[in-house]
Amino acid sequence: MSLFPIFLKLTKKKCVVVGAGKIAAAKAAGLLRSDAHVVVVGPEATEWVQDQAREGKLIWQPREFAADDIAQAFLVIAATSSSAANEAVFRACAAHRVLCNVVDDPERCDFFYPAVVRRGPLQIAISTGGQSPALARRLRTELEQQFGPEYGEWVEYVGEMRKQILRQRLTTQERRRLMDKISSPKSLEQFLRDRRPA
């Protein structure tokens, strides 16, 4: 199976999580970090889901899944403890051409959750195509050690420098040369030296 790696803009897009237990809550939390409009469907929910609903950060429908829950959804995650319920969610999504991820069931996934290293605006995603989530987690741990928190600050700095370069009247070649320079290992070393307290 060949997968297409992609980062999605989910801001204000309806994303439905079916199930309201710990796994579903973790999926909902990730969607909220992406500013999605999150709807959680499940008769019982974790305290976190209930708290987020009370604070207006997500919508919780305290009942079983119904096919019309996916109306106008951009994507759906099925994270119930019932394989029959997850299958019903998957079939409804397929019928309405809505992207679906059934947790721990690669055959019923239009997309997979990668293991992600987050350092501010820097995101490094690792996927094994559903073959070995444990390996993806191990690689994430290794990358977390390699790319410390300072990388987030450096990426923000590089982004600001890029804006300044784009405002200048430069040829494409000059612009590319400067971009390569500010994103080089030497640039990182200089950035780290400059940010150290005297």
Please identify what each model-predicted range represents.
Residues D51-A71:
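Glycine-rich, highly charged phosphate/nucleotide-binding loops
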Residues V102-G152:
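E1/E1-like adenylate-forming module used to activate ubiquitin-like modifiers
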Residues M1-A53:
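Hydrophobic, well-ordered beta-alpha structural blocks that scaffold small-molecule cofactor pockets
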Residues G42, W60-E64, D104:
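Short loop/edge segments at beta-strand edges and connector loops
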